[in-house]
């Protein structure tokens, strides 16, 4: 037990329990302590050492937890159990259930004096908000935690979360600043700092600072190799793959991604390994279309992983949409439509991007089957989603995809309109 900080509350609890037990200060003190020492502790003028607090808890027949925090050992166990269940729900992909549990925990008055436990619950609630697509709410909580005293690991985790949340919210300057300022304070690289650096890379891509991204990824890879830990190697190589892809180095991208996946698989299962298999499959489909069968192998493995370990509906839907793409490329159009429909069924209403992709895949498959009416219907549904999409940079990509699908269906007017929408979304 670390040295206990001087606290009026600790002294008040000792005084309250002593009186409840019908003891005088002298009776509580005898024979190990002086009554004047007890008086100083109760008035908050003296900080009791850990050993003294343990002694007083024994003599008062109460828990050390109560003297320290104002909650009994049983109440502390209940709080820790509630936190564990909330964390487990979040880990299992049950974001809405986790959010409810964290909110209920933070409403418990017994949590008030338990700073570390409260901070853990607030971190959890912020992560749950993010998993529910509620970025603004998550940012508010993390910003509030910025003003508190946190461990080094928590400071890095907070910076990583804010960097990611600012990025997906389009606040790119803040995304870069929060990560760069935290990285600047490091004395040496660690796994956590490499992961923060990997998150910063994504902000560089979004900002269009690809030269800085290429320079920084080299530094990040060197740091990961020097550390030699699986955690650092996966983070650095995985994000190096994205950087290589964004800068037009497709071969490098696939090599980095496969290296990251190999390290991840070698060091045991992870809930992220399924999503990693899907991404590697996507790279094969886009960069090496002649190896579609290889991509399907990765997708089959991903679906197996998702069936054996927790996965979000988003992750499972994404795997099915990539499988639909692979089946279209292989000419198995009925199977492609089936996988796209499965993906759509799994998607939450907020998943605009994947919903657009699903409708475009179905439209393309129907078009290749010469089912013009069904193809046009799916294309129309994709366009409806695109009209509501807030992120212009992503809308550009999908308007171009809609234009290509319109051309496939022989709808030249629709293709021209979609190209114009793409240019407008790009600000041209």
Predicted feature locations:
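A short, Lys/Arg-rich alpha-helix, primarily the initiator
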Residues: 1-20
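Short alpha-helical DNA-recognition segment
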Residues: 19-40
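DNA major-groove recognition helix of helix-turn-helix/homeodomain DNA-binding modules
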Residues: 51-66
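Tandem amphipathic alpha-helical repeat scaffolds
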Residues: 81-92, 117-133, 156-171, 194-209, ...
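TPR-repeat structural position
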Residues: 95, 115, 135, 172, ...
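Amphipathic alpha-helical segments of tetratricopeptide repeats
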Residues: 103-110, 143-148, 180-187, 217-229, ...
């Amino acid at each position: 037990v670390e040295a206990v900080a001087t606290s009026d509350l600790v002294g008040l609890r000792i005084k309250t329990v002593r009186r409840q037990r019908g003891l005088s200060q002298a009776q509580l003190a005898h024979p190990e302590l002086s009554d004047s020492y007890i008086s100083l502790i109760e008035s908050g003028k003296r900080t009791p050492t850990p050993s003294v607090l343990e002694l007083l808890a024994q003599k008062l027949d109460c828990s050390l937890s109560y003297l320290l925090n104002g909650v009994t050992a049983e109440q502390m166990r209940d709080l820790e159990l509630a936190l564990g269940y909330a964390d487990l729900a979040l880990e299992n992909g049950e974001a809405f259930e986790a959010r409810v549990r964290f909110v209920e925990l933070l409403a418990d008055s017994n949590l008030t004096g338990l700073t570390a436990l409260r901070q853990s619950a607030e971190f959890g609630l912020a992560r749950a908000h993010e998993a529910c697509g509620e970025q603004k709410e998550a940012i508010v909580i993390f910003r509030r935690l910025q003003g508190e005293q946190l461990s080094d690991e928590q400071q890095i985790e907070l910076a990583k979360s804010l960097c990611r949340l600012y990025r997906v919210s389009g606040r790119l300057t803040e995304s870069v600043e929060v990560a760069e300022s935290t990285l600047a304070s490091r004395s040496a690289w660690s796994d956590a700092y490499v992961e923060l650096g990997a998150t910063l890379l994504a902000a560089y891509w979004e900002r269009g600072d690809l030269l800085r991204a290429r320079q920084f990824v080299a530094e990040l890879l060197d740091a990961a190799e020097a550390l030699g830990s699986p955690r650092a190697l996966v983070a650095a190589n995985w994000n190096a793959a994205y950087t290589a892809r964004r800068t037009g180095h497709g071969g490098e991208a696939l090599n980095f991604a496969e290296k990251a996946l190999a390290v991840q698989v070698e060091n045991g299962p992870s809930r992220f390994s399924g999503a990693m298999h899907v991404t590697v499959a996507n790279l094969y489909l886009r960069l090496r279309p002649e190896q579609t069968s290889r991509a399907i192998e990765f997708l089959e493995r991903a679906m197996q992983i998702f069936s054996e370990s927790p996965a979000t509906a988003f992750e499972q839907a994404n795997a099915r949409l990539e499988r639909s793409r692979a089946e279209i490329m292989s000419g198995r159009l009925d199977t492609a439509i089936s996988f796209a429909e499965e993906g759509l069924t799994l998607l939450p209403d907020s998943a605009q991007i994947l919903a657009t992709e699903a409708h475009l895949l179905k439209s393309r498959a129907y078009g290749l089957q010469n089912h013009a009416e069904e193809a046009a219907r799916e294309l129309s549904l994709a366009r409806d989603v695109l009209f509501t999409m807030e992120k212009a940079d992503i809308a550009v990509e999908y308007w171009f995809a809609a234009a290509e699908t319109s051309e496939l269906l022989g709808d030249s007017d629709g293709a021209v309109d979609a190209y114009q929408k793409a240019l407008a979304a790009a600000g041209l």
